[in-house]
């Protein structure tokens, strides 16, 4: 794998991934964070794929059957720091739905790379100026880099995706030679039920080592689906019998608008350079003799929060056993 070059690290956040879809020109999709695979009401259907972030460790192996089937679009990760975009694009290339439009950037990439081998596909992806520009639009603005000794390296965090193709579920990991077949499901079965034990096993393994992870789902654009439902209800509401349902849909659409606006604001904050402000604030606090105490308090609070989150995850996994 080549050096990071001009690819930046980006956060594992549904707002980042959803806006990245918009940047690529994708229509009909969004990304949602999942806190549990057991809460069916909280999951949007259909779910086109899952994106799993975990801390990669030497020797970690996933049980599965390597597959070189031609109907799976798979590209290697050939450059560091691009694993988030790599995972998302590997997933998008395998979505087969007429309601989903990939847009010019990804359609051109797919048409060019479809007949290439996985490694060459990866090089084509990492050399795409348009894809890199969208990826780097989420870079954190800073005047310098801090080398914090003893901290966890962001480079060790890695994304993989799970995608249903035919009646099999595959793990697409750009660091592997081939996709892995990790589950099988019947035609009438929800593929999420088939992959659930695999993901829960990985979550349990990583939580035991106090290693953070998160899970996101690629799902239909909720606002578009709600608007389609609204149009159907309005057409069927000849006797004003569906006013309550229409009101509920209006509220759900407003909630989606609010969520997307929050995503936009958070992404703008990510792009803003706060360094001059922080430096000036630290100077003032140091001059007043408050800086060391505040840093110590913040460090202890962060440790306690991390321990609490780990304990909650362990309890949740034990409850499911």
From Swiss-Prot:
<dbReference type="GO" id="GO:0032435">
    <property type="term" value="P:negative regulation of proteasomal ubiquitin-dependent protein catabolic process"/>
</dbReference>
<comment type="function">
    <text>Ubiquitin-protein hydrolase involved both in the processing of ubiquitin precursors and of ubiquitinated proteins. This enzyme is a thiol protease that recognizes and hydrolyzes a peptide bond at the C-terminal glycine of ubiquitin.</text>
</comment>
<comment type="subunit">
    <text>Interacts with proteasome 19S subunit rpn-13.</text>
</comment>
<feature type="active site" description="Proton donor">
    <location>
        <position position="158"/>
    </location>
</feature>
<comment type="similarity">
    <text>Belongs to the peptidase C12 family.</text>
</comment>
<dbReference type="InterPro" id="IPR038765">
    <property type="entry name" value="Papain-like_cys_pep_sf"/>
</dbReference>
<feature type="site" description="Transition state stabilizer">
    <location>
        <position position="77"/>
    </location>
</feature>
<feature type="site" description="Important for enzyme activity">
    <location>
        <position position="173"/>
    </location>
</feature>
<dbReference type="GO" id="GO:0016579">
    <property type="term" value="P:protein deubiquitination"/>
</dbReference>
<dbReference type="InterPro" id="IPR041507">
    <property type="entry name" value="UCH_C"/>
</dbReference>
<keyword id="KW-0378">Hydrolase</keyword>
<dbReference type="GO" id="GO:0033044">
    <property type="term" value="P:regulation of chromosome organization"/>
</dbReference>
<dbReference type="InterPro" id="IPR001578">
    <property type="entry name" value="Peptidase_C12_UCH"/>
</dbReference>
<feature type="domain" description="UCH catalytic">
    <location>
        <begin position="6"/>
        <end position="220"/>
    </location>
</feature>
<keyword id="KW-0833">Ubl conjugation pathway</keyword>
<feature type="active site" description="Nucleophile">
    <location>
        <position position="83"/>
    </location>
</feature>
<feature type="domain" description="ULD">
    <location>
        <begin position="273"/>
        <end position="301"/>
    </location>
</feature>
<dbReference type="GO" id="GO:0004843">
    <property type="term" value="F:cysteine-type deubiquitinase activity"/>
</dbReference>
<dbReference type="Pfam" id="PF18031">
    <property type="entry name" value="UCH_C"/>
</dbReference>
<protein>
    <recommendedName>
        <fullName>Ubiquitin carboxyl-terminal hydrolase ubh-4</fullName>
        <ecNumber>3.4.19.12</ecNumber>
    </recommendedName>
</protein>
<dbReference type="GO" id="GO:0006511">
    <property type="term" value="P:ubiquitin-dependent protein catabolic process"/>
</dbReference>
<dbReference type="GO" id="GO:0005737">
    <property type="term" value="C:cytoplasm"/>
</dbReference>
<keyword id="KW-0645">Protease</keyword>
<dbReference type="InterPro" id="IPR017390">
    <property type="entry name" value="Ubiquitinyl_hydrolase_UCH37"/>
</dbReference>
<dbReference type="Pfam" id="PF01088">
    <property type="entry name" value="Peptidase_C12"/>
</dbReference>
<keyword id="KW-0788">Thiol protease</keyword>
<dbReference type="InterPro" id="IPR036959">
    <property type="entry name" value="Peptidase_C12_UCH_sf"/>
</dbReference>
């Amino acid at each position: 794998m080549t050096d990071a070059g001009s690819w930046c690290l980006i956060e594992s956040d549904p707002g980042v991934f959803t806006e990245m879809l918009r940047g690529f020109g994708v229509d009909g999709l969004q990304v949602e964070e999942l806190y549990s695979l057991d809460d069916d009401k909280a999951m949007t259907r259909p779910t086109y794929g899952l994106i799993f972030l975990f801390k990669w460790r030497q020797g970690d192996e996933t049980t599965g059957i390597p597959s070189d089937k031609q109907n799976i679009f798979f590209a290697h990760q050939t450059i560091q720091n691009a694993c988030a975009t790599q995972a998302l694009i590997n997933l998008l290339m395998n979505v087969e739905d007429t309601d989903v439009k990939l847009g010019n950037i990804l359609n051109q990439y797919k048409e060019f790379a479809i007949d290439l081998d996985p490694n060459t596909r990866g090089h084509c992806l990492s050399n795409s100026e348009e894809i890199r520009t969208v990826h780097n639009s989420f870079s954190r603005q800073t005047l310098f880099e801090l080398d914090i000794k003893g901290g966890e390296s962001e480079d060790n965090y890695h994304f993989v995706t799970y995608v249903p193709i035919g009646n099999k579920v595959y793990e697409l990991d750009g660091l592997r030679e081939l996709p892995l077949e990790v589950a099988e499901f019947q035609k009438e079965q929800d593929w999420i039920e088939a992959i659930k034990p695999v993901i829960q096993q990985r979550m349990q393994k990583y939580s035991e080592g106090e290693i953070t992870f998160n899970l996101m789902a690629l799902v239909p654009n909720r606002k578009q689906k709600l608007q389609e439902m609204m149009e159907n209800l309005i057409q069927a509401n000849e006797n004003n019998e569906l006013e309550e349902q229409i009101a509920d849909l209006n509220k759900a659409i407003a909630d989606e608008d609010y969520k997307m606006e929050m995503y936009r604001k958070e992404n703008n904050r990510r792009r803003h350079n706060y360094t001059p402000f922080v430096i000036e604030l630290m100077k003032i606090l140091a001059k007043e003799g408050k800086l060391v105490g505040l840093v110590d308090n913040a460090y202890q609070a962060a440790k306690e929060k991390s321990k609490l989150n780990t304990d909650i995850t362990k309890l949740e996994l034990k409850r499911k056993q």
